[in-house]
């Protein structure tokens, strides 16, 4: 709890409230100064909407009205000013440079919808309703159905008119999560059918070939996050299905998890004398690498620890939960 309290200071010091969409600053951050930057990003590195949900939930638990107030300001500002003409998120906005990135990614769009469905479900449980947000998110999920290819994949990048910029399907599993969540929240079976179709693609093109690629956005190559997302996508469908279907998805989650774990360090990398991280005593065991292009450690984990703990129980395979503890 003490560590959460310390980390919650991020929500205070990074909050930017003088732009058309309020956000938590963190993209392009200079670690020497931690000064606020002009970049508002919905998913990927910025994760502004998921951070807002985390700040709201934690703020209410701790009776921190400052965190709660700012979280609602972010959600309200994005509802009013955070969408493109077609209705996708303006996923990256550069305020001082005065431009919005015109190319959308299924990764950031999916992570934005994922965050909003967490927010809406939490608010529903508290007896609070947000019909305008529900309308927006349902519209986005419907656009996902339109964007999905016949083979079940989603294009990695696209424009506001649905024209394709990067047809690679490696980012597909990022869409599976909000589709399953949308099915649960809106009780719309089309979203579940779409989610199942994504995993048909994943099984055929990624999991069966052990070829996981193009999920991260700072490179376009084989990467950790494609396997991590594939495992998590299959896990979500296992939770949403029963019987033989559930068992099949669980098996896919396990197979992809084995590959994802190969990206995580099982040892502490030695540093040369004088290197800052070595001098600070950084231990790399449990940290993940990123991709074959970006060879550095990375904090990305999110749902995957839950997936590992679930797999440990599902298959009585304790090494999954053991390594989840190492990562945590």
Regions found by a protein language model. Name each.
Residues 33-38, 43-85, 98-110, 123-142, ...:
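Aromatic- and glycine-enriched glycan-recognition loops and surfaces
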Residues 30-48, 95-111, 156-174, 211-232, ...:
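Solvent-exposed loop and edge beta-strand segments that line ligand/cofactor-binding
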Residues 49-65, 111-129, 174-189, 229-245, ...:
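Well-ordered alpha-helical scaffold segments within catalytic/enzyme domains
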Residues 1-43, 72-73, 77-94, 138, ...:
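Low-complexity, Ser/Thr/Pro/Gly-enriched N-terminal "stalk/linker" regions
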Residues 9-13, 199-212, 216, 241-328:
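Non-catalytic carbohydrate-binding regions of carbohydrate-active enzymes
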Residues 2-14, 63-81, 125-146, 187-204, ...:
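Extended, well-ordered alpha-helical scaffold segments
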Residues 96-100, 118-189, 197, 204, ...:
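Active-site lining segments of carbohydrate-active enzymes
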Residues 1-12, 47-56, 240:
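Extracellular/surface-associated beta-sandwich interaction domains
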